Amino acid sequence: VSDTGDFRAGDVLSVACPFTPARVERAVTWGCISVRWPWWGIDTGSDFARWNGIVALGVPGSGRSAPEAEAELFRTDPPPERLGAGDICRVGVPPTMVHVTAVDHHDPPLESGWLPRPRLTVSVLRRGLSYREYPDESHLDGTGYSIHPGDGIPFTFELLLRPYASLQPGDEVADAAGRAWRFDGPWDWTAFDGEPAGAGPEWPLVLLTRAGTPCTVEDAEAVAASTASGSHRKTVRDWMSLTRASPTS
């Protein structure tokens, strides 16, 4: 997985960011520690967003922290409780398993108040957290913790699991029970017979179309091979076992 946008809902990733020196602007207050951000510049040309160069990082397990703090990826070294205003620390992301809940592309780039302006937002939650724990009215907007690959923060990503990796959003398939489906993500299946999705498609699957046109023999063989054994239910179970979370729909 790279910064160019090869992310899908359902992906399980290991994400990391090298620890970089930063100045503490405010010690832990109401579950957050505020630091002068070492990666972004202030977007003085923005007409809509203003940013002062400071980022408040959630401190999980800090007692009064909001639920959003539990989703925080960034950590400080030394730990937040040992830091005060004016101290120099290091901030980064140790290798952390996350699952992707949503992917949004921005054209034109998002006016966020900082530079470079984000072209991509990937919402993630750490292992053990499910999107249902962060309702739409929360700061996380029902999806998760937002990162912006390609925005200057030197994230690295390792793809650990991609359910239905042989399929692409928009693919149309037929299942072993004779039902036709549209695939828009591992947890987003639409049956063309209008009936509820129920337990999902019955394996093996036959690829019918890709990008609205008849599929190639090679693509059809890849889908058939990847669904020759196992089941949709097993795919969900394996994903939940790895992430310790619930699917996003």
Protein language model annotation of sequence segments:
Residues 15-17, 28, 37, 91, ...:
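Acidic surface patches and DE-rich sequence motifs
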Residues 17-19, 40, 93-95, 129, ...:
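Glycine-centered tight beta-turn/hairpin loop motif at sheet-sheet or coil-to-beta transitions
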Residues 1-2, 7-10, 34-36, 46, ...:
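N-terminal leader/presequence-like segments
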Residues 19-30, 95-112, 179-188:
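Short beta-strand-centered aromatic/proline hotspots
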